[in-house]
Amino acid sequence: MAKESTFNPEHQATHTSSKVVAALERISEAFRVMLWQEAKQYGISPIQVQILTYLLHYPEKLKTVTHLAAHFNMTKATVSDAIKSIAAKGFVKRKEDSEDSRSHSLHLTREGKALARKVERFAEPMEISVQKMGPEKQSGILEQLLYLIQDLNGQLVITPQRMCLNCRFYEKKGKLHYCNLVNAFLKAGDLRVDCPEFRMPAG
């Protein structure tokens, strides 16, 4: 017997897991809509909106095609094509590595920074909705979403993310979260989706 589709409303009625998946799919649709609406205003693509936003906030060591590809779960070729387009428009420039001429980092030009500060606001409607939930619900949702992301990492659906649960400094002590870098327990709301001190586990 074939497995029922997650997106069959009749199946969803008696399967909470399918309703959760369907709800997450609706949220992903909302992000696609918000990205497209922002991108079309400036004649760029949704991934270019995300790249500009990324380059505005991340440190130089992470401003490479390799890191961008891992962050957005795309091939390096796809990311390179997107960068070539916004570089041609004068929004991004490449900086050669002083120690390795084959390597380079990516930087926003003055025009690129100005555009990035505009387009990075694409998710504001989602932020407003989340803020209405209150701190306790936000923390609970954050914790469960991080567990979901971690499981998808394990299934190789997406690349490992720079979050607490994947970090060598993270430890689960019973039901509590502990960071061995700062030697402190973390509340669910303190967990990070992307931590600047992230280190991959050894081995």
What function would you assign to each model-found segment?
Residues 36-75:
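N-terminal helix-turn-helix DNA-binding core of bacterial DNA-binding proteins
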Residues 85-138:
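Charged, amphipathic alpha-helical coiled-coil/dimerization segments
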Residues 19, 23, 30, 50-54, ...:
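Pre-recognition alpha-helix immediately N-terminal to the DNA-recognition helix
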Residues 1-4, 171-203:
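Long, low-complexity, charge-rich intrinsically disordered regions
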Residues 60-104:
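Canonical helix-turn-helix DNA-binding module
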Residues 121-168:
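Terminal interaction helix/tail motif
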Residues 1-42:
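N-terminal leader segment of winged-helix/HTH proteins
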Residues 34-45, 127-136:
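Short amphipathic alpha-helical boundary/capping segments
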